[in-house]
Amino acid sequence: MANVVVVGAQWGDEGKGKIVDWLSEQADIVARFQGGHNAGHTLVINGETYKLALLPSGVLRPSKLAVIGNGVVFDPQAFLDEVERLTKQGVAISPENLRVAENVTLILPLHRELDALRENASKATAIGTTQRGIGPAYEDKVGRRAIRLMDLADIDTLPHKIERLLTHHNALRRGLGLAEFEAGAILKELTALAPKLLPYAETVWRLLDIKRREGKRILFEGAQGALLDVDHGTYPYVTSSNTVAAQAATGTGMGPGSVGYVLGICKAYTTRVGQGPFPTELDNEIGRKIGERGREFGTNTGRPRRCGWFDAVLVRQTVRTCGIHGLALTKLDILDGFEQIEVCVGYRLDGKEIDHLPAGEGAQARVEPIYETIEGWKEPTANARSWAELPAQAIKYVRRIEELVGCPVALLSTSPEREDTILVQNPFEA
């Protein structure tokens, strides 16, 4: 399989950034296909820490082409700020190595403000968004009123498109008793941004099709996780886009046959940020210990992540909905030293055992985990780079996960460092 898709197999924050960076050495192109700057990656390369939000991880690899696809929602100011920050760290970013889909939807200040207003209106209705305007921007995209990157190149039609957008947003603001946005101010802002952004604009579907026909390897980089998918996740506590592997095609303009190998990333335990069901959550000393050892705080928001035992039911479900061929298991080292480790192998709902997470919000909140206890290990797995360096019991744990989720482990990560990775099966050669 020439191309590889990387998706999160849990609720995001699984360590996709490191795995994508590690795989990007073998790729010619790294393409983002959904989400926005709400999904943070932390990469450690030769002791230097890089934090990415909107940019594909491929920008850290010289000679690689990074692409932001049409399925992404694109915040111009966040983009420019991230480019500036990484440039100060010595990363070369220019239109030569980064292209942005000309039909990508823009996130504007009015989207961020609306997102925050909704999220802070009531704790009862809060979803746990990052308040960065992601959801409102996707709403405008579906509502056919969004401003897209290509619109900045047509100054004659841009004012009309802004007026159309404000017809909707100012009606909302009047209902909320807020001052209306002025079209002139938005036009001035976008006109000033245009010369900084348009050099990156590209007909991405055509570019990728040409590269594919030339035999170039494409690595599709997903954001967040499959359990946050707007259709297949824990609705309504989800993101506003499709995060499953099939979106790699839609979000870049490629055909489904171009996707290739699907690599699912999951931690050796489970975490979640924000609201929503979490069957294996540990609201106790063990959960806090996992969080502290794993440094479980959001890259973008700094919010502490909720922590719990590995949930084989959920990962098995995402293996199916994403068509995952192999898993990359991360943060195995965080479980070093635990005498016993619990793994969720099923659920109990209203007295009955079930083998999947139900779609209903109420049922999701009522499921109880059924655990299997596995003996832990005392020897360290941290920084291991081969199976021979792993404790026997840690290997048994990995093998049991493979059995429970019905999918082999292709990669094993034992630290944030790029090189601390054990390769079982190369996704590009599978």
From Swiss-Prot:
It is found in: Cytoplasm. Substrate binds at T299, N300, T301, G302, R303, P304, R305. Pathway: Purine metabolism; AMP biosynthesis via de novo pathway; AMP from IMP: step 1/2. Plays an important role in the de novo pathway of purine nucleotide biosynthesis. Catalyzes the first committed step in the biosynthesis of AMP from IMP. GTP binds at residues 12-18, 40-42, 305, 331-333, 413-415. One of its GO terms (cellular component) is cytoplasm. Its cofactor is Mg(2+). The active site is at D13 (proton acceptor), H41 (proton donor). The keyword Nucleotide-binding applies. It catalyses: IMP + L-aspartate + GTP = N(6)-(1,2-dicarboxyethyl)-AMP + GDP + phosphate + 2 H(+). GO terms for molecular function: adenylosuccinate synthase activity; GTP binding; magnesium ion binding. InterPro entries: Adenylosuccin_syn_GTP-bd, Adenylosuccin_syn_Lys_AS, Adenylosuccinate_synth_dom1, Adenylosuccinate_synth_dom2, Adenylosuccinate_synth_dom3, Adenylosuccinate_synthetase, P-loop_NTPase. This is Adenylosuccinate synthetase. Binds 1 Mg(2+) ion per subunit. Its main location: cytoplasm. SUPFAM superfamilies: P-loop containing nucleoside triphosphate hydrolases (SSF52540). Its EC number is 6.3.4.4. IMP binds at D13, E14, G15, K16, N38, A39, G40, H41, T130, R144, Q224, T239, R303. Coiled coil: none annotated. It comes from the Bacteria. Mg(2+) binds at D13, G40. Belongs to the adenylosuccinate synthetase family. HAMAP family: Adenylosucc_synth.
